Amino acid sequence: MRSRKIPLVVAAAASASMLLASCGGGGEDDGATTGTLDFYTNKAAWEPDFDELNAASESRADITLNTTGYSDAEQYDAFVRQSFRTDKSPGLFTWQTGPSLAELVEEDLIAETTDIWTKAVDSGWVSTDLRETYTYDGKQYCVPMNIAYWVMYYNKNIFAEQGIEEPTTWAELNSIAERLTGAGITPYYQTSTLFTFQWFQQMVAGTDPELYEGLSTGEVKYTDPRIVDIMETWLDQEEAGWFSDAGSTTDPAVGLKQGDYAMINFGSFFNGSLDGAGMVSGEDYDMFVIPATNPDLEQTPVAVESGPLCVAENSSQKTLGLTYSEWWMSPEAQTAWSEARGDVAFNPKATVADPMLEELGTTVASDDYQLYDRYYEATPTPILTVALEQFGAFIANPGDPMPFLETIQAEADDYWAEQE
């Protein structure tokens, strides 16, 4: 496993130090399996959802979450890292998958959850693909707090008016884009800020999942001829007018509603935004899993975004945190969480309030699909930062992809050289 240097966030770390000052080493596990569990999260806006979930966890597991939410990401990260040096290590906390989680695992700061995952997989509660996201050197750490599958949303009225059915192949999807363009309708949404990676992610993984993985490990260069060919295809699509105005300030959900474009590639959490814009799930909008670019792939790759719930190895509430984590994986817990958050459940045996999301969860859990980590989590942070900027620049002013790819690769070369 590759490791990376942990960035220091000095100001936030100092703040965290004052909160946890001079507490000494880690606390001894008290062995409790019921009671109040101290839970820290960087999703402060979700506190009401976790509070709502307490009704289920109290009655089913006899555990109540005492939630402390942070809205500042840097301050939260510094707080958690500092807590590992004290006797206040959290019994349960949220984090990020990918290199950020790998750092904590490599430093032996996270409690192992292999037994929990084994039970969940054997019970049909979770896919083996998702387990890989939480696997380091053959062992599992943390459990998924939430999950989002990156799919294609579409305006049902536009599809109906144009006589379009959901595509099952990449060729059919391209034909749809051509048909829409011919009718004066922009096929796809795009933006030049932050969410600039998804079309690149989709085409690379849909061409060859191993090629995509190679970018995240440094085994494949961004200037690889196969990557260049994919970018050339993207350029052709841009020049054909398949994508929306990258500089538009219209809310993406509103844009789909009013027909600024027919489709948008987004995470399955986007249902909430569309509902908030006044669209009705299954009536005004629907979704489909994007077909693989390469028709010869045996499984259709699906990007997955998952945020972990972790237990600190030296927490005095380690056993309580692991007990809650085991319950969290169950159908009853995920049903309750779906009711509280309105999200798709990673457990295919859970009941999801939105039939569309329930169907999606069941679909991608089948053997016909292969889950892979979203580019945002799969890519080391220094490379990601440059890549998002370069993809955004390419989207804003489409042109020869090589200068953009060379800039990303220069950062990748520097990063991987430091890992030797």
Regions found by a protein language model. Name each.
Residues 179, 217-246:
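Glycine-centered hinge/linker elements that transmit conformational signals in sensory
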Residues 228, 232, 240, 277-340:
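Extracytoplasmic/periplasmic substrate-recognition and gating elements
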Residues 98-150, 174, 282, 286-288:
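Hinge/lid segment of periplasmic solute-binding proteins
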Residues 2-102, 166, 279, 290, ...:
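Conserved N-terminal structural module of periplasmic/extracytoplasmic solute-binding proteins
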Residues 114-126, 192, 208-229, 276-280, ...:
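Short, solvent-exposed loop/beta-turn-alpha elements that line the ligand-binding surface or hinge
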Residues 82-83, 90-91, 122-157, 186-187, ...:
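A structural signal for short loop-to-beta-strand junctions that line the ligand-binding cleft
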Residues 137, 141-145, 150, 174-220, ...:
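Extracytoplasmic/periplasmic solute-binding protein
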Residues 343-344, 361-413:
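C-terminal capping/gating helix-and-loop segments adjacent to ligand/active sites or protein-protein/ligand interfaces
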